[in-house]
Every structure is written in C-alpha cells, then in structure tokens.
Amino acid sequence: MAATRNLSLLAQSSQPWAGIYGSHGSPRPISSWLRRQSIAKTSYICMCTPLSMSQLIATPLITDIESLLKYLRQPQVLPHEIDDSTKRRELLERTRRELQTTLEPLQAMKMIDTLQRLGLAYHFEDDINSLLTGFSNGQPDEDLLTASLRFRLLRHNGHRINPNIFQKFMDKQGKFIDSLKEDTRGLFSLYEASYLGANGEDILLQALEFTKAHLKESLPSLAPPLAKKVSQALELPRHRRMARLEARRYIEEYGGENGHSPDLLELAKLDYNKVQSLHQLELSEISRWWKQLGLVDKLTFARDRPLECFLWTVGILPEPKYSSCRIELAKTIAILLVIDDIFDTHGTLDELILFTNAIRRWDLEAMEDLPEYMRICYMALYNTTNEICYKILKQNGWSVLPYLKATWIDMIEGFMLEASWLNTGYVPNMEEYVENGVTTAGAYMALVHLFFLIGQGVTEENVKLLVKPYPKLFSYSGRILRLWDDLGTAKEEQERGDLASSIDLFMRENNITSDEEGRKCILKIIDNLWKELNGELVSRHALPLAIIKAAFNMARASQVVYQHEEDSYFSSVDNYVQALFFTPFN
C-alpha cells in the first residue's frame, strides 16, 4: 500500500446509530418503528465439489464480463421463462406422498437425509419439520446408527436434543463400548453427528475422538463405496459442507448406491438444472449491473470477480427463494473487493483518510475532496446501498439505512486501522488482528444486510442486536472466515507486503517456528470456533433461524473457497463456478 506518514487527518467518528432506539419492551413487529427512520434519495452518476474426472465441461471458459454476458445471452442457456415441467411436478408430488406415508422412523430419517444431500429438502420444509418434531423422543432399542442420525438431523435443523442419548452406548467408566468399532456404519453416523457438538458437550468430543480413530484404522479394509464416503468425511464432515456443492457431488454419487430411487435421482437432476437456470438469470442481472457500474474500467487495479462474488452468495443462501437476496448481496461483496484493493494496493494514506471521513459523512458533498477514482467508488457504494434500502422499504416498509450505513463505516474504519498499523510499523496481537479482520472481511456487513434482505422474524428487539458489539453468532462465523482467508491467501499477501497474518501472529506469540505446525494450530482454533458456533444453534436465540443458517453457511463457504488441494475433496473456485452455474446434468 502506498502511504505517507500523516495521520493527523483521521478524525474520530461518532456512532451513526446513536439515538435511533425506542423504549425497551417485549419483542414486537418492527414495521411501524422502522418506517419512522429516514432514507436518503438515490443519486445516479453514470460470483463442494469438483466435477468427476469422467464428466466433461461442455461450456467455454468464462474469463471476463463480456464472455459471461455473451454466454448468458444464448437462448438455450438463458430461456425467456424457466420451464417447470410436468414430469418434475409429478416427481415432487410422488416424493411428498412417500415422505408423508413412511411410517418406520429410520427409513423416514434416511429419506430426509437423502433429500437434504440432493438439494431437494427446500420443497418439503413443512413435512420435514413435522416429521422431525415427532423424532424428538427416540426409541429405547434404537441402535447407534439410528440414534446418531436422529441427533444430527434434529440439531442441524434447529431442534433441541440432548447428547446424553449416547450414554447408552458407553460403559461404566464413561467410555464408548469397544464393540462399537465393529459397527462401521454406526460409527460413521456417530462421527458425522459429533461435529454438531458445542463446547461443554464432552460426550460428543469423546465420540469424535473414538470414531475418528477407528474409522481411520478400518479405512483400508472397507468396501470401495463406503471407503470413499468415509475418506471424504474424514477430510470434510457433512456439517461443514456447502449445500449446493454437496448436492452436485451427491447427485453424481447417488445413482451408484444400492437401493437408490431412480425417481429421486431423476428429480434431483431436473431440480438441479432448474436451480442452475435460476442462477444464470441472477448472474445475468449481476453482470449487467457490474458492467454498467464501470468500476473496473476506471479503477484498473481493482478485482473483477462477479462470478466469485456470486459463488459466495450461493454458499450463504442456497435456497432458490432467496434469489433477490443473492443478487443484492453479490453487489455488496463486489464493491467490498474494490474498496479492499483501494486500501491494500492503491491509495496513499492521505487519500485513505479522506475516503474514510467521506464514508462517515455519507452524503454527496463529502466526495468533493476525493480523487476521481475514489469518487467513482464512493458513488457506487452510496447508490448501491441506498438502492438496497429502497427495495427493503418497498417490500417491508422498513427504513434500514442507519444499520447498513453503520456496517460500511465500521468496515472502512477497520481498513483504516490496518493501514495505520502498516504505516507506523505497529504489530497487533492476534486477538486485535482477528477481531478487526472479521470486520474487514465483510462478515458483519454481509450478515446485517442479509438480516433485512431476508426479512423473516424481524422485531424491534432483535434489530437492537445489529450494532457493535455484533452478535456472537456473527463473530464466530466471521472469525472462521477470517482464519480460512489467511490460510488460503497469507503467502500471496505477504509477498506484496501486507500485514502479518493470523498464522504469523500466532506463531510469534507462541514461539512456533514451523509453518506447518502454525497452520495446524489455526485449524484447531477453527475447530473450537465451530463448537462455539454450534452452541449458538443449541441456545434459544433471539435471532431468526434464517439468519442463523446464513451465518453457518458463511463459515461453510469460507473453507470451500479458500482451501484448494489436488486429489482431495476440494477443488478450485473456477471448477466450482463451472459445476454450479454452467454444467447441467444430462
């Protein structure tokens, strides 16, 4: 980052949300209260698995906006209307009847699990929740596989269940019965369930250690199909997988399973292709917006990654019903990348201070003192945020500008803090770095925007949680994002002279000299953060379930985006984009 040593222009900011709260009381719908807030007028100045090796990508490589728009204009790719075929509707109704009439609990749970893995569960949310409510109390004679599957499904879907159900599989010394290691499928089910454990749930920690050791030991002797499943789960358990990538991978795998349903496989492929067509419509809108915005034409140093931005939104919000939310979130992420590049690679310190103060003021006159390239970025942020606020106002009658604006101010101040650290040579401790890094990674910004864009379960009481200090749920998810970002990009950022990463800071504070050991320690910290995150799912939370799921999905997407390894579960972002958005099933 180009910088001078003049810090005198950096003014202290006041909290932009001061005075916007009413009296405390019981939670109530927030519509009338939010309508009292003001909204600025908009001014206009004018992106879990790789494809199988045997499956060819039948689409051209998408390298820039022009090639993307050209591809999306093809009528066979982007139809005028998305066809909802009679066959697909028939298969959906047939599946619904089967789900509703399956009486045996284990078979019903297996069907729910399969629907979720294939990406079809969103069609049957009410039926699934009704069934899961009935599974809250297990049977005294249920085996390890059944108990573990029941636990995982209930907790994953936000239902309360106590891990003490596994005590029946332990001996008098409080250890898991040794004979369980002969039940490979039961062990596998318990292994997957153990990853939903929260801090303090020692029985699940013990279950993880017990199952992981025995599954690794038994891996060489397992039949190939089961061995592949176990190997992939040891690398990335189900609980941490990105939903749409898991659907892609499992659809490819499901047809080879004994006893699979041909109807369900056909439905999964038809539905995947339909959702892919929806994603192409969304990409078309985002790409046209990005091209019209013209940021990277004027700011040639900035990243041009609408496809990657959209991949993030599909990871965070996989359900088709959130189409408009994905579009708006992708816009904010794209602008965030440009601002990050301004602070990291282009702006002088004096310019960054001017930009920070202009964002704090949040009015058009504030940009008069900015250099031209910053004015363009400022207007893009100003207009886009106000447009999002206007859409929320039209849809729900809520005026949310104070909240969205505050997240951008927090983030810009976080970037400015990092710039001052780099300029003065200050080395933060790891906690300082990570806490600020959650802000600059955009975690708080994205989740606060989504809270209002999703618009479910919004009350005056839970809106009060959306300011500093942000909810722990947001912080845990954001810390996982920050740490995975560092694991994936630390080397490149160090080469261009950026701040030390969390890996470097942790190694320095703990006298670690091996990079490999340092990375392993960061992975352990991520594991502990997942336990904290799971605790938010267990607790009775004031935030709506939809935003809780979005926070979990952000953590899931961060590992998929930043961990790329050959010959493993993980692949490159380009492969994910091709598989999700441009390669339909036959």
UniProtKB/Swiss-Prot annotation:
Transit peptide residue numbers: 1-47
Signal peptide: none
CC cofactor note: Binds 3 Mg(2+) ions per subunit.
Binding site for Mg(2+) 2: 340, 344
Motif position, DDXXD motif: 340-344
GO molecular function terms listed in the Swiss-Prot or TrEMBL record: hydrolase activity; magnesium ion binding; terpene synthase activity
Any one Pfam family match given in the protein's UniProt record, by short name: Terpene_synth_C
Main location class: plastid
Biochemical pathway: Secondary metabolite biosynthesis; terpenoid biosynthesis
Cellular compartment(s): Plastid, Chloroplast
Superkingdom as given in the UniProt entry: Eukaryota
Keywords linked to the UniProt accession: Chloroplast, Hydrolase, Magnesium, Metal-binding, Plastid, Transit peptide
GO BP, sorted A to Z: diterpenoid biosynthetic process
Subunit field text: Monomer.
PANTHER family recorded: OS04G0344100 PROTEIN-RELATED, TERPENE SYNTHASE 11-RELATED
Role noted for this protein: Monoterpene synthase involved in the biosynthesis of volatile organic compounds. Mediates the conversion of (2E)-geranyl diphosphate (GPP) into the acyclic monoterpene, geraniol. Does not use (2E,6E)-farnesyl diphosphate (FPP) as substrate.
Family: Belongs to the terpene synthase family. Tpsg subfamily.
Name used for this protein in its record: Monoterpene synthase TPS4, chloroplastic
Organism this protein belongs to: Cananga odorata (Ylang-ylang tree)
Gene: TPS4
